């Protein structure tokens, strides 16, 4: 079977997306990465996977504060901290004074400053309070909300990948701009 066989290409794209967006050891290859870069549909598929796995905590017979902790720990164990690192970089860039070159330099700096720590802390607080608000709505409703949130987030990524333009060369430039509106549909 070659990559021109539809099922193989789809499988490669989904494996590439899982390898990129999660810490699940799928054993991806360069062919998987390349298939993923051409397949915006693979992003929401991973949203269903992540939402389904992390949303499972809502079926645990625990008190709401423990549920919130289990959700956050499960989310970061499953997806890693790459997204949190990017969020901290964004917070540092927003806090810096200067021109676009100075802002880009802060984005590339590996140290986290006050702006990054503040944005990350506020974001974690908002997510924790959001999850806490699910207490009492029922396990299945909470589960469906988490799945919908993850799928929606991945659809947002697909939208940016298909319609956005990369600001500079980097990892994002390998995804953004390589697809078009037909890929999103």
Where in this protein do the model-derived segments appear?
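Topogenic membrane-insertion module of multi-pass membrane proteins
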Residues: 1-72, 76
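Solvent-exposed interhelical
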Residues: 155-184
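Transmembrane alpha-helical segments of multi-pass membrane transport proteins and ion-pumping complexes
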Residues: 51-59, 76, 80-81, 85, ...
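Short juxtamembrane and helix-loop transition motifs at transmembrane-helix boundaries
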Residues: 30-38, 106-111, 169-176
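Multi-pass membrane catalytic core of lipid/isoprenoid biosynthesis enzymes
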Residues: 36-54, 93-136, 140, 144-148, ...
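Transmembrane alpha-helical segments that form the membrane-embedded catalytic/substrate-channel core
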Residues: 17-21, 73-83, 147-163
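Hydrophobic, membrane-facing alpha-helical anchors
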Residues: 18, 24-27, 95-98, 159-166
């Amino acid at each position: 079977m070659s990559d021109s066989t539809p099922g193989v290409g789809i499988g490669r794209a989904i494996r590439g997306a899982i390898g990129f967006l999660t810490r699940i050891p799928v054993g991806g290859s360069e062919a998987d990465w390349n298939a993923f870069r051409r397949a915006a549909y693979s992003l929401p598929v991973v949203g269903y996977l992540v939402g389904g796995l992390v949303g499972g905590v809502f079926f645990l017979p625990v008190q709401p504060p423990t549920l919130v902790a289990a959700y956050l720990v499960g989310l970061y164990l499953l997806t890693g901290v790459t997204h949190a690192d990017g969020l901290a970089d964004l917070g540092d860039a927003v806090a810096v004074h200067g021109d676009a070159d100075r802002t880009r330099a802060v984005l590339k700096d590996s140290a986290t400053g006050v702006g990054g720590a503040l944005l990350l802390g506020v974001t974690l607080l908002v997510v924790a309070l959001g999850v806490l608000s699910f207490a009492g709505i029922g396990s299945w409703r909470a589960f469906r909300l988490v799945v919908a949130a993850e799928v929606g987030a991945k659809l947002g990524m697909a939208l940016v990948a298909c319609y956005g333009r990369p600001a500079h060369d980097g990892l994002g430039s390998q995804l953004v701009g390589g697809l078009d509106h037909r890929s999103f549909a």
